[in-house]
């Protein structure tokens, strides 16, 4: 973004606003995401014009980080991602901690249900796995990569798989 705020330069606010609305028409965006996308698309825009366009959208409730967080959490949960992963994603998209905490809780009982469901899908026919085996380690790593807490992983493995020690 150009910090060059020339007074003789025409305002770019309507163009920025229209572009932001086009992005928002496709899906909800955090304010941080919109800033990044608009900066990439219109690198010569002034900071003032960009901020003015985004402030207007927020004032008119066309952009809301709360709405974005709510939609994002629901979407990522539907794709099998859990607390730690979704939380990190929201922070990387510039969503404030208070908003993240309002829409995401590590105590949500859905996480355990999701972990159980994932194990059922990953190992549908086999209910016995050797503890510490390649298959066991792979399953634990997969659940960790999805953002499940260790206690959820252990509980899901314990409930759904008979671990055999060698």
Predicted region positions:
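An alpha-helical, amphipathic repeat domain used for nucleic-acid recognition
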Residues: 1-166
